[in-house]
């Protein structure tokens, strides 16, 4: 029995999230069906992050166990020949039995993209939120976000339906910057609550539009005022960038941040 790790990229626009579910097309189901076709075995996959419907991934990490003669590094090419073009396997490697795509991760990285231009852009429409009504103040947004760093209870930023025992998690870093008309919100954390990033971004946009102050934003999550959370950012602007481990298991690729920066003029 071998454990195989996959570095996976997908456009989540037409998928009901990562996790397999009844009467819906998901990334996990699509990947497992492709694995069945090539191995003739029922394969259970595990991911570093369970992305919601419409959310993308530029460097999702997945693993599965298999008893098969196929070389580990061949799965990427074979799977890419079977999978829809919206799902790509960037690399496949064999890992230790003790390594787990989810539990071995030190932290995960999500990025949210806001198009703050007055004009729509079809070339980034499926991967950004076109919020154009007011020019966002990214400095205010950044100032409001910094107090979230560290371990806190983020109950206010958790959608109903979560199966977690508690809403405590540790945010490693929040970075918000403007690149011309685009606002990039990068959040790194040990774990994320259900709908957490989209709820955070929704409230930060209100801060950037000066509809609420940074102090009100902080009061909402510190005092768990869930009913005061008024807006959730659309799924299409959110991307699971990567998961970070003590040791990089992928041999060919040293940095699995594959976010398409070539679309962003002046990005560095």
From Swiss-Prot:
Catalytic activity of the protein:
uridine(38/39/40) in tRNA = pseudouridine(38/39/40) in tRNA
- What GO molecular function annotations does the UniProt record carry, in alphabetical order? RNA binding; tRNA pseudouridine(38-40) synthase activity
The record ties this protein, via Pfam families, to: PseudoU_synth_1 (PF01416)
Catalytic machinery residues = 52 (nucleophile)
Q: Which Gene3D superfamilies match?
A: Pseudouridine synthase I, catalytic domain, C-terminal subdomain, Pseudouridine synthase I, catalytic domain, N-terminal subdomain
Methyltransferase keyword on record: no
Single biological process term from Gene Ontology:
tRNA pseudouridine synthesis
The Enzyme Commission number assigned here is 5.4.99.12
Q: Which UniProt keywords apply?
A: Isomerase, tRNA processing
UniProt-annotated binding residues for substrate: 110
InterPro entries, sorted = PsdUridine_synth_cat_dom_sf, PsdUridine_synth_TruA, PsdUridine_synth_TruA_a/b_dom, PsdUridine_synth_TruA_C, TruA/RsuA/RluB/E/F_N
Enzyme kind, highest EC tier: isomerase
State the similarity comment: Belongs to the tRNA pseudouridine synthase TruA family.
Job of this protein: Formation of pseudouridine at positions 38, 39 and 40 in the anticodon stem and loop of transfer RNAs.
**Subunit field text:** Homodimer.
What PANTHER family does the annotation carry? PSEUDOURIDYLATE SYNTHASE, TRNA PSEUDOURIDINE SYNTHASE-LIKE 1
Protein name stated in the entry? tRNA pseudouridine synthase A
Which organism's genome codes for this protein? Prochlorococcus marinus (strain MIT 9312)
């Amino acid at each position: 029995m071998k454990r195989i790790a996959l570095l996976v990229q997908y456009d989540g626009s037409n998928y009901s999230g990562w996790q397999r579910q009844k009467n819906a097309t998901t990334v996990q189901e699509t990947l497992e069906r492709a694995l069945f076709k090539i191995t003739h075995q029922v394969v259970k996959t595990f991911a570093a992050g369970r992305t919601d419907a419409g959310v993308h991934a530029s460097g999702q990490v997945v693993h599965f166990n298999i008893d098969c003669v196929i070389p580990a590094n061949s799965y990427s090419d074979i799977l890419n020949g079977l999978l829809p073009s919206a799902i790509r396997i960037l690399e496949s490697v064999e890992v230790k039995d003790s390594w787990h795509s989810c539990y071995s991760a030190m932290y995960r990285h999500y990025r949210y993209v806001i198009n703050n231009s007055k004009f729509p852009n079809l070339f980034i429409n499926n991967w950004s939120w076109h919020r154009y009504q007011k020019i966002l103040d990214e400095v205010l947004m950044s100032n409001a976000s910094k107090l979230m760093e560290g371990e806190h209870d983020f109950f206010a930023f958790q959608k109903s339906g979560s199966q977690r025992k508690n809403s405590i998690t540790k945010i490693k870093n929040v970075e918000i910057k403007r690149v011309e008309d685009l606002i990039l919100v990068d959040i790194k954390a040990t774990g994320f609550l259900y709908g957490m990033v989209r709820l955070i971004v929704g409230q930060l946009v209100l801060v950037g539009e000066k509809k609420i102050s940074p102090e009100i934003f902080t009061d909402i999550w510190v005092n768990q005022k869930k009913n005061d959370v008024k807006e959730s950012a659309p799924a299409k602007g959110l991307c699971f960038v990567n998961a970070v481990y003590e040791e990089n298991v992928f041999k060919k690729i040293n940095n699995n941040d594959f976010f398409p920066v070539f679309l962003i003029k002046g990005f560095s």
